[in-house]
């Protein structure tokens, strides 16, 4: 069994670590509250905008539109946006996002040459991983989460739109974490461009709308806004998921530290009791020897 001094130092060290993890948990909880508030604030606007577009697309022959952003062409160049956090200590959050992106590439794009795939990392952990992976990495937007704003998200979305319209890429995929609650994150891979016709967001109410100006002009105005809003939603979800994952990880670490402290205190008491018992036995033995 370890000596008294060694156990005492270990208890002191674990208590110090416990204070750090508890503080990090509280900070993450505060950041999570702010992040979820931003999601709730933006969601009604994003959902309504998506509903308007879906209602238009549901009654439109996409082949009649020539907006550029809905152009489906053979995929020769692929852009994959991978969102992660900048920092660790958030459990398996970053590794699960990287696994999701690797699975996307190995399953859906297994026939692609690495030189035909560009990774756009948003978050330092994604950048650190993919710089060593052999893919071309576009590093201009790594630091979005240092100061997450709509303007920052819109800048990345505009770069993606411009690149797609210039035919630098034929398809864009986004890997991000969809926020459910502090303990649950859903790791998503979604096709971002070209814009696909989808009825999942369309209103269930049947109505015959009159559009002024015409649908093509309306979509031309709406699509860039929707694309920027959608990308910002991905970023907000990932940001909230990060803080939730870190809060849970630090809570678990704090509890584990508490359990370890209890076990160490038991070891300390046992060692102390053993030392006292040995001293008593030495004294008794010495006294008996003198009497003899």
Give, region by region, the residue ranges found by the protein language model:
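C-terminal beta-strand-loop-alpha-helix "lid" module of Rossmann-like NAD(P)-dependent dehydrogenases
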Residues: 1-292
């Amino acid at each position: 069994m370890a000596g008294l001094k060694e156990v005492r130092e270990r208890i002191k060290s674990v208590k110090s670590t416990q204070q750090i993890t508890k503080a990090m948990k509280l900070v993450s909880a505060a950041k999570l509250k702010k992040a979820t508030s931003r999601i709730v604030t933006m969601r009604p606007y994003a959902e309504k905008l998506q509903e308007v577009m879906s209602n238009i697309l549901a009654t439109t022959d996409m082949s009649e539109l020539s907006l550029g952003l809905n152009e489906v062409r053979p995929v020769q160049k692929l852009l994959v946006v991978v969102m992660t956090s900048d920092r660790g200590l958030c459990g398996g959050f970053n590794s699960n996002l990287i696994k999701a992106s690797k699975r996307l590439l190995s399953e859906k794009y297994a026939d692609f040459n690495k030189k035909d795939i560009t990774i756009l990392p948003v978050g330092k952990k994604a950048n650190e991983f993919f710089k060593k992976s052999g893919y071309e990495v576009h590093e201009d937007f790594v630091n979005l989460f240092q100061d997450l704003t709509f303007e920052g998200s819109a800048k990345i979305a505009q770069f993606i739109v411009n690149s797609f319209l210039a035919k630098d890429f034929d398809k864009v995929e986004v890997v991000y974490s969809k926020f459910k609650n502090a303990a649950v994150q859903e790791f998503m891979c979604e096709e971002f461009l070209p814009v696909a016709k989808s009825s999942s967001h369309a209103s269930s109410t049947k109505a015959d709308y009159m559009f002024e100006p015409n649908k093509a002009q309306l979509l031309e105005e709406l699509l860039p806004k929707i694309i920027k809003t959608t990308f910002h939603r991905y970023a907000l979800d990932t940001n909230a998921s990060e803080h939730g994952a870190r809060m849970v990880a630090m809570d678990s670490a704090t509890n584990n530290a508490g359990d370890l402290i209890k076990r160490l205190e038991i070891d300390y008491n046992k060692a102390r009791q053993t030392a006292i018992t040995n001293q008593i036995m030495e004294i008794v033995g010495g006294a008996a020897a003198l009497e003899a």
